[in-house]
Amino acid sequence: GVAGAQGGTLTFIVGGSDTALVQARPLLEAMGKNIFHAGDAGAGQVAKICNNMLLSVLMSGTAEALQLGVDNGLDPSVLSEIMRKSSGGNWALEVYNPYPGVMEPAPASRDYEGGFLVDLMIKDLGLAMASALDTGTATPMGSLARSLYVAHGDNGFGQVDFSSIQKLFQRD
């Protein structure tokens, strides 16, 4: 987002000709640290929706596991550290924990304000599902994650960060 661009930490996934990438590289390097050339025009979009589909699966699975632990009496910070250092370790546990109060810079500790909106995740998951349909690719995990995010958005959380999927699993 804006903070990433200002800090020069964005990741760019680019599709297009080598010549176009050479021309765009100085601008991209001013805002990002990772620039990937995915292939021809359109390849960057495909790579992005694949990445975001995986991210939605990881985030919803992380939120579900954290809630199971909390509901069984575990401290979410302790469980997060155990999973982070074990085979369940993933990006959400490393830098974007969905459980409030576990990771101060994460949106979960700011009432899920800022970050990547649920509505945008739903859009990208819709694009991923359309691509899967076009290619005949089985995406049962992506489809389930999309259903979870659509339900979460329908519950009024479309305009907050996608890590707020944690709320879908919480008992009030």
Give residue spans per PLM region.
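Rossmann-fold dinucleotide-binding core
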Residues: 1-52
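Helical "substrate-binding/catalytic lid" subdomain
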Residues: 43-144, 148-172
